[in-house]
A protein has these predicted regions:
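N-terminal active-site wall of soluble small-molecule enzyme domains
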Residues: 32-103
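Hydrophobic faces of well-ordered beta-strands that scaffold small-molecule active sites
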Residues: 3-8, 31-33, 62-66, 86-88, ...
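Glycine-rich phosphate-binding active-site loops on the catalytic face of alpha/beta enzymes
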Residues: 86-94, 135-147, 189-212
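Glycine-enriched alpha-helix->loop->beta-strand junction motifs that scaffold or abut catalytic
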Residues: 27-30, 57-60, 79-86, 105-112, ...
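Active-site beta-loop-alpha junctions enriched in small/polar residues
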Residues: 8-12, 36-38, 67-71, 91, ...
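Catalytic cores of alpha/beta
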Residues: 19-24, 70-80, 119-130, 177-194
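C-terminal helical cap(s) of enzyme catalytic domains, especially alpha/beta-barrels
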Residues: 201-234
């Protein structure tokens, strides 16, 4: 089964940047980069500059998750550097969503939206047909290691039904505490992409290869699904 993992680079060991990116780039579907402004969430994280550094050593897709009050400001910079997916918070785009999506698509890139645990699918229904990806937060955003919110998985199930019914093309991604304890529950909801961070991948060992193999073992043990460990992009 083609399980897609997207490592959250906010939780990687930056002292081992080249080593960890080099090992993961042929094994994962994409890299997940959190960009926070300290206002939408009470934290600061990675930046467009960081994405540029990743792109210098890897051609793996990069998905930027904006946790910012002004997504338009950040989107312009992310377009300039060719970020594959630009995903903005649903809570901040009322009145600019169509304009923002059109700008991203006009640049040949893909647009996504992120739903926090309290945010309903109905809030994006007016533009859901234009989205390339929908990310469901299964934790409160802003910090690694937050408590897993099982109820958020219902949105994944409902999005799959809606996608099939209306023939939408968006990918469904989950973000938050994806690890040995939650893999089985998440798999039952069946997202297209699993974002894995400290508890699911990077924190399992100081050695990235050991961490990766442990994550794969945990996933296969908890779900009964065999993981293809090499991504063929040809």
């Amino acid at each position: 089964m083609n399980i897609k993992f997207s490592p959250s680079l906010m939780t990687m060991d930056l002292d081992k940047f080249s080593e960890q990116i080099g090992f993961l780039k042929d094994k994962v579907d994409s890299f997940h980069v959190d960009i926070m402004d300290g206002h939408f969430v009470s934290n600061l994280s990675l930046s467009p500059w960081f994405i540029e550094q990743v792109k210098k050593v890897s051609d793996t897709q990069i998905s930027a998750h904006l946790m910012v009050e002004d997504p338009s400001f950040w989107t312009d910079r992310l377009i300039d550097i060719g970020t594959d997916f630009i995903c903005f918070p649903a809570e901040t785009v009322n009145g600019i969503a169509f304009r923002l999506i059109n700008k991203i698509h006009s640049s040949g890139l893909r647009a996504g939206v992120v739903l926090n645990p309290e945010t309903s699918i109905s809030s994006i229904e007016s533009y859901i047909d234009k989205l390339d990806k929908i990310t469901i937060m299964t934790v409160d955003p802003g910090f690694a290691g937050e408590i897993f919110i099982k109820k958020s998985l219902e949105k994944i199930v409902n999005l799959r039904k809606e996608r099939e019914k209306f023939n939408y093309h968006f990918l469904i991604e989950m973000d938050g505490s994806s690890n040995k304890k939650s893999f089985s529950m998440i798999h039952q909801a069946n997202p297209d992409i699993y974002i894995v961070g400290r508890s699911g991948l990077f924190g399992l060992s100081s050695d990235i290869e050991t961490s990766w193999q442990e994550m794969i073992k945990n996933f296969e043990t908890e779900t009964g699904v065999k993981v293809n460990q090499f991504v063929n992009r040809e």
